[in-house]
């Protein structure tokens, strides 16, 4: 129904409807060619809203009303009406403007106010008018008028004024506080608007005349003109770049919108992920490789950003990223001759501009396959760290480890294929992914590494010059390590690689090679000044070297290597497996992230069990030797005291039940070995179930049995050499189930090293203790001598107490002289013995010096975890 057919139409209603005119109605009013209708419409729509004018007009003219009032003669002025009335109406007639013209006039008025106040530094008024102008722009967009060209001129003018004012304010502070705040706010808003209209802003700078013509027209007219110019001037690369940025395809428009919103607050990242997934699904078969590569890179980054505030990436998102990363590699491998993604690529100013092709015709897009794989692997590690290691979820999640390893090998092959040969040893991205590959295999046994390698190379077309397809496991480790050692930029990669190699050879029962690598690397000289991750890896390699020495039968070396780290009370921290000095909730996020996942941990119970077993085999014979030669104090050391304290604590117990823990088994085995019962000791040690964690369990138990037989024989000799004059070698052979040659060899070694001084083997049948120059005393005689010495000391003390320290001074002096004479006689008796043992002692001292030097080589790295950076202390 037309608005004219409304009863009771008044000037008030007409003024209200004037603001509600639609665009189509405005065009109809402006396109009418009939002068009379125009005049009558103008007189009608031009009625003033002022109430005084309305009342006077109604009283004098007698304005008609009713349903057909516009047909009445008095309404149709100039069509037979009164001339006097017509003349008076012509004088008061106003020009009717459309909503478009009125809006443009309001915008120009705001521009005039802005221009007049910006020169006076009235920035509060300028800011208010600019905000008002922004509301006008919103109305322009709502009515499909578009943004006028003079808005770009306004932005340019304000930007120049702001720059000039900023330069003046550096020298003289003339702005008041409120004006300065308004100025800073306006400056930020102008910058934001310029970024939004950057293309038109740059075009205005180059060609301002284009914006002076028909400045009321929308910016789209400038765009159309620019596109025509670009077609005519295809050689102009700058204008071509502007045109490509200006007319973005739907794909790049979506990517640009998401890229600009990254890092901002209150952004629904899951919605962005869904948008990119739909975009990829819709264009996967019809888009160019450059567009697909851009979508994949943006999608991977947004997924990682979505989980940045979480403890770890959700499994569903992780699996999608892994699949999309594989699809991206498929795309890159299919277009390797035209497109490459590398950290060596150059960035472009606009998201939709492809990089310039190099001499080989390949366009290198800036990106990093290595960083994406690293981030994906880190998210898997964080997921394992936050999962109960004893649950089935951990086992299921650990299955993804083989998936990520396949992706790492594939990524290494691709990065290696696009890296020039002359920069291969300078490439950071290639070194990082090679190190990541080594991190995934160094702690595994050979059989598992071989299976992983075969599966990883199954679907890879490229071959590798670093590690060729089909190489043995040892060759894989050696060649990866050799490549990282040749890196010229970051020497830390080579250090990590050597420690990984030491760990690998130690785990796989190649102790001699692991030891050679460790001593040749000389990490022990400056490890305390290294970074924390390197220190942790050093401690892990050192511990694994000690375990490998134990499995190889090098008991003393294993004891030296493990001694300090087991007794440090900080073994968890030193190995990157937890915290001893703080509760888990006190650890920072960075400290927890540096911890290793559970499946890479070294079993601390196994470590302690190995160390205590080594202590048993070394210190039980030593304790027996000391107990039967109380004058030899050179054998005493801290480790003996610690182990002896465990035995003394056990002896003080009123009731001791059967062994339950690992420590109980070892203590009971020690007591049995002290008595020479090596078989009982072996049965107790072999019943410990933790030995099954070693892959070569049977060989290990056989080695332990042989060591217990040998140390049992030595303990037996030390204990009973003062009781027997001769011992039958055949009897010793039967007791300890050793061959005759082995028994003779052990006894000869004991005599040579001075453990059994003066002993002699007669016809390989007996060992005689009578040729020694030491007095052969029984145990009772030795105890009687000790008791006599203590009684003498007690008597002297009582005599001093009785005389209050002053009486019988002469008697005490005589006693002292007598004691001095006795000591001189004893010294003369021992002089011959000391001369005989001089060479042995010098040799022993040199051996001790060498052992101390070698022990210093096996000192652990002191990792300090008291701060977030996990720094080392020297």
Swiss-Prot record:
Sections of the chain in a coiled coil: none
Domain PCI per the UniProt entry, residue ranges: 598-774
Comp. bias regions, Polar residues: 862-874
GO biological process: formation of cytoplasmic translation initiation complex; translational initiation
InterPro entries for this protein: EIF3C (IPR027516), EIF3C_N_dom (IPR008905), PCI_dom (IPR000717)
Keyword Signal applies: no
Pfam families in the record: eIF-3c_N, PCI
Cell compartment(s), UniProt: Cytoplasm
Listed GO MF terms: RNA binding; translation initiation factor activity; translation initiation factor binding
Keywords: Cytoplasm, Initiation factor, Protein biosynthesis
Region called Disordered, residue ranges: 1-70, 797-874
Cellular component annotations (GO), alphabetically ordered: cytoplasmic stress granule; eukaryotic 43S preinitiation complex; eukaryotic 48S preinitiation complex; eukaryotic translation initiation factor 3 complex; eukaryotic translation initiation factor 3 complex, eIF3e; eukaryotic translation initiation factor 3 complex, eIF3m; multi-eIF complex
Compositional bias ranges of the Acidic residues kind: 14-61
Compositional bias (Low complexity): 813-848
Protein family (similarity comment): Belongs to the eIF-3 subunit C family.
HAMAP family: eIF3c (MF_03002)
SUBUNIT field: Component of the eukaryotic translation initiation factor 3 (eIF-3) complex.
Role of this protein: Component of the eukaryotic translation initiation factor 3 (eIF-3) complex, which is involved in protein synthesis of a specialized repertoire of mRNAs and, together with other initiation factors, stimulates binding of mRNA and methionyl-tRNAi to the 40S ribosome. The eIF-3 complex specifically targets and initiates translation of a subset of mRNAs involved in cell proliferation.
Stated name of the protein: Eukaryotic translation initiation factor 3 subunit C
Record organism: Candida albicans (strain SC5314 / ATCC MYA-2876)
Lineage, top ranks: Eukaryota, Fungi, Dikarya, Ascomycota, Saccharomycotina
